[in-house]
A protein has these predicted regions:
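All-alpha prenyltransferase/terpene-synthase fold signal
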Residues: 1-219
Length: 219
């Protein structure tokens, strides 16, 4: 599902990005028509994988249905697709709201689905929602910082990239926002102390999202 969203996001009619993670984008190699079809095919493949690969003896069907509904919500007309629309529309929408929809929804869904599969309590699900949303937006803010620095160095290739934190607030304010989101995400994990070391990867992912490819000290 995430791969499908990235393929579509890179299209000329969207962010118009010829590369992704240092490699040519899907449409750059195979053409726009094939990239659209690839994204369209990957979305349902994700749902099929969930249904076919989740052990029925370990995960109740009711939990599985909640996972499918959650993912569908996060990528649909009130989630990621809404964020992309607002980004393309270019209206007065706040950059924070756009980033929450484009990136926060998927981060939230990823965290919540893990909770559903594990049988988490309702209050834990809400903490996971807030954690995942914070990490998703954090990832986007750091991406904006990296992209801005690449542009300064003569790189960066997202021609139609919409609003970003760095364009609206500048790099220093964007870094402050990233620090705020990192703290918020970790704060939500404070309610999971009873799980001990099993929650450590969630803390590590927050630091990874914050630290990758840039140093706060040289901002």
């Amino acid at each position: 599902v995430h791969a499908a969203s990235l393929i579509h996001d890179d299209l000329p009619c969207m962010d118009d990005s010829p590369s992704r993670r240092g490699q040519p984008s899907n449409h750059t190699i195979y053409g726009v028509d094939m990239a659209i079809l690839a994204g369209d095919a990957l979305f349902p493949l994700g749902f099929r994988h969930i249904v076919s690969q989740t052990p029925s003896d370990l995960v109740p069907e009711s939990h599985l249905l909640r996972v499918i509904a959650e993912i569908a919500r996060s990528v649909g007309s009130t989630g990621m697709a809404a964020g992309q629309f607002l980004d393309l529309e270019g209206g007065p929408n706040a950059v924070g709201f756009i980033q929450e929809k484009k990136f926060g929804e998927m981060g939230e869904s990823s965290a919540v689905c893990g909770g559903f599969l594990a049988g988490a309590e309702d209050d834990e699900i809400e903490r996971l929602r807030r954690y995942g949303r914070a990490v998703g937006v954090l990832y986007a803010v750091v991406d904006d910082i990296i992209e801005e620095r690449l542009k300064v160095e003569g790189g960066g290739d997202r021609k139609n990239k919409g609003k970003s934190y760095t364009e609206v607030y500048g790099v220093e304010k964007a870094i402050e926002k990233a620090e705020e989101l990192r703290a918020k995400a970790k704060e939500e994990l404070d309610g999971f102390e009873k799980y001990g070391e099993r929650v450590f990867p969630l803390y590590s992912f927050v630091d990874f999202a914050f630290d990758r490819s840039f140093s706060v000290d040289d901002a």
